A protein has these predicted regions:
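Terminal low-complexity "docking" segments
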Residues: 2-122, 126-175
């Protein structure tokens, strides 16, 4: 597991206003990048590959999107349909602002291999995220979450939720 550059947690999840985010794998279907461009016009968004060596593939990488605090954005119906057939959407809640969440997720992209080379860790893919929950230590899972209080993804028709308890500061996983 990469040592994601740890950021301080934003306090207890229940004490602060949670912002809603989604992490979308734009490579899920051939039409996903075009659909994202259509739906993202009025929402804060950025590809996690934008400042990476993979920048030339930013349109096909994972995108962080901030959803409105209240109400539903048109993109949400499309995302729910996308996640029915592809493990391509992660619904996140964080007290952190867009830049804090983006910066944290960006720092978790690289995995240092034993030989010193870097590999891309596809944690935004729901299938990979579920496997990571099984193999990472509790501390590593908390590092991956960073400022994220709740992470929900759908794999094989089942919701997987990892959340930080506001009362005990501990991480919980419901699959």
């Amino acid at each position: 597991m990469p040592a994601c550059r740890s950021r301080p947690r934003c306090g207890h999840a229940g004490a602060l206003t949670m912002q809603r985010y989604v992490l979308v794998d734009a490579s899920a279907r051939p039409d996903t990048p075009q659909a994202l461009r259509y739906y993202l016009q009025d929402l804060p968004h950025r590809s996690l590959f934008a400042r990476q060596p993979e920048a030339e593939h930013a349109d096909l990488g994972p995108w962080l999107v901030q959803l409105p605090e209240f109400g539903q954005a048109p993109i949400e119906g499309w995302l729910r349909a996308l996640e029915q057939g592809h493990p391509a959407v992660a619904w996140l809640a964080s007290a952190g602002d867009f830049d804090a969440v983006f910066d944290h997720l960006e720092t978790c992209l690289d995995l240092r291999r034993p030989n010193g080379t870097l590999a891309l860790l596809r944690y935004w893919d729901g299938r990979v995220f579920v496997r990571l929950q099984r193999i990472l230590t509790a501390n590593q899972r908390l590092q991956l979450l960073g400022p994220i209080a709740r992470w929900r993804t759908r794999v094989l028709g089942e919701d997987v939720v990892v959340s930080l308890s506001a009362t005990d500061g501990q991480e919980h996983c419901d699959a």
